[in-house]
């Protein structure tokens, strides 16, 4: 993710890495390697993926900011000004956030048997986020669809709309969630790390 952000001309001093009290040795070693280049904040406990919405943290954030999980692969065709485009969508549509759609096209590499929960596959679950296009947007297409911690730009002005108040931008903005692909099968150690109350797929 860090390399992808740099390729989009995002300055390293504008990138903040928030760690939720990780114990994985490999990850801790990685933090040591990058701590002089990026802003690194270590929480003293695992507060979950939405900890930044807690008032005493949220109040410190700028009016517009972006949050992402690290396991996304950007679309190679996504424009370098994608942050500004997402920001403008939050203004035009009075939204808390605007983010990237997630690719669920069933390629041979896509793990179609991966379960999102006990009742449905990832594909079955994710279909709900492709049902409601906003007709005035065509290139790229924009869908009314909630976002948790997938890459999104946040507009603090509209936090009262609710945490999931969002749109997802498709076409050249559509990205891949790497754990859904067979060539990115995660290790048992990583599965154990993800197998918490915060995980929404397994």
Task: Please place each PLM-identified region on the residue numbering.
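Short, well-formed alpha-helical segments that are part of the catalytic scaffolds
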Residues: 1-8
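Residues at the starts of beta-strands that form the adenosine-phosphate
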Residues: 13-14
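Acidic ATP/Mg2+-coordinating residue in the GHKL
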Residues: 19-20
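Active-site-proximal specificity loops/subdomain of glycosyltransferases
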Residues: 23-64
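Short beta-strand-to-loop acidic/aromatic patch adjacent to the donor-nucleotide binding site
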Residues: 62-77
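Conserved donor-nucleotide/metal-binding helix-loop-beta segment in metal-dependent transferases, i.e.
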Residues: 78-97
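Short beta-strand-to-loop element that shapes/binds the nucleotide-sugar donor at the catalytic cleft/hinge
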Residues: 98-113
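C-terminal catalytic/acceptor-binding lobe
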Residues: 119-202
């Amino acid at each position: 993710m860090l390399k992808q952000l740099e390729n989009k001309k995002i300055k390293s001093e504008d990138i903040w890495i928030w760690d939720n009290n990780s114990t994985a040795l490999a990850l801790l070693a990685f933090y040591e390697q990058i701590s002089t280049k990026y802003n690194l904040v270590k929480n003293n406990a695992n507060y979950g993926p939405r900890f930044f919405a807690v008032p005493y943290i949220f109040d410190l954030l700028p009016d517009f900011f972006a949050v992402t999980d690290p396991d996304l692969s950007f679309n190679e065709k996504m424009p370098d000004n994608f942050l500004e485009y997402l920001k403008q969508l939050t203004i035009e549509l009075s939204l808390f956030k605007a983010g990237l759609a997630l690719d669920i096209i069933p390629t041979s590499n896509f793990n179609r048997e991966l379960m999102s929960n006990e009742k449905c596959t990832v594909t079955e679950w994710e279909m709900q986020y492709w049902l409601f296009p906003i007709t005035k947007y065509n290139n790229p297409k924009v869908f009314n669809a909630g976002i948790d911690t997938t890459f999104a730009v946040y507009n603090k002005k509209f936090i009262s709309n609710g945490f999931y108040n969002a749109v997802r931008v498709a076409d050249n903005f559509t990205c891949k969630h790497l754990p859904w692909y067979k060539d990115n099968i995660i290790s048992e150690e990583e599965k154990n790390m993800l197998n918490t109350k915060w995980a929404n797929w397994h």
